[in-house]
Amino acid sequence: MSRPRRRGRDIHGVLLLDKPQGMSSNDVLQKVKRIYNANRAGHTGALDPLATGMLPICLGEATKFSQYLLDSDKRYRVIARLGQRTDTSDADGQIVQERPVTFSAEQLAAALETFRGDIEQIPSMYSALKYQGKKLYEYARQGIEVPREARPITVYELLFIRHEGDELELEVHCSKGTYIRTIIDDLGEKLGCGAHVIFLRRLAVSKYPVDRMVTLEQLRELVEQAERQDIPAAQLLDPLLMPMDSPASDYPVVNLPLTSSVYFKNGNPVRTTGVPLEGLVRVTEGDDEKFIGMGEIDDEGRVAPRRLVVEYPA
């Protein structure tokens, strides 16, 4: 007879993890899930093993709203190695071409300018995007290249930090779907020398406060501290979580009276005052404005439920 699966506890919120280098985003996710003993967990856009920085991890009911963070802006610090191109566009790949670095400061400035604003980007073969139901990196590992369509992205800000020898450091504020490795690879080709990423740190996701980031080591230390104090680890861990609706913080709020929210929570569109003309909204209820889910304004101006909170912390 097989043992019953361990369910974990109902804990809801978003942990802003400072991902360490050399670990996959999924490995980090599983460690956080175990530390919190959470019944559900999911991240909001993977970071490459080489990369460090902000990785929002959603626990419990917050996983329902992680999709809204996938659409948010990101900010990165990146260091590129000039003169070498790799098959993965980063230091984890194999060098496929080496060329001298001969561009001038003026040529660099002109090249950087072409990556600012609304541009189109062809994703790397080493990405998790799918082609005919299979991830691109699975084809790449078999030595197969498949067609990829250019996708529109926006680079809101591309800051030059330094150029020393064969290293170039930049800061990038960009829209969803932007591959920093691809920007560096494309920039290297435009400069005629090739380039690949040797350091990448995600500085920010959406409007999350950077000072709320924590490391795996800090989480483990809190667990050990709780053991020494003979208290539940949750007393020290749970205050680190951001609210479960924080992934959707960019959307306007509609507060429903309790007389209307009961219908909304049962899956029915409701009418109320002070709603926008269209689009998605965060829906709260009552005087304490408890978050109950995401809604969308329908053609009749009603708030229609889209994603509802089923469980809620007591």
Curated annotation (Swiss-Prot):
Swiss-Prot/TrEMBL GO biological process terms: mRNA pseudouridine synthesis; tRNA pseudouridine synthesis
Protein known as: tRNA pseudouridine synthase B
Signal peptide: none
NCBIfam families given in the database record: TruB (TIGR00431)
CDD domains named in the record: PseudoU_synth_EcTruB (cd02573), PUA_TruB_bacterial (cd21152)
PANTHER family in the record: PSEUDOURIDYLATE SYNTHASE TRUB1 (PTHR13767:SF2), TRNA-PSEUDOURIDINE SYNTHASE (PTHR13767)
Binding site residues for substrate: H43, Y76, Y179, L200
InterPro entries documented for this protein: PsdUridine_synth_cat_dom_sf, PsdUridine_synth_N, PUA-like_sf, PUA_sf, tRNA_psdUridine_synth_TruB, tRNA_sdUridine_synth_fam1_C, TruB_C
Active site, renumbered: D48
Homology family: Belongs to the pseudouridine synthase TruB family. Type 1 subfamily.
Gene3D superfamilies according to UniProt: Pseudouridine synthase (3.30.2350.10), PUA domain (2.30.130.10)
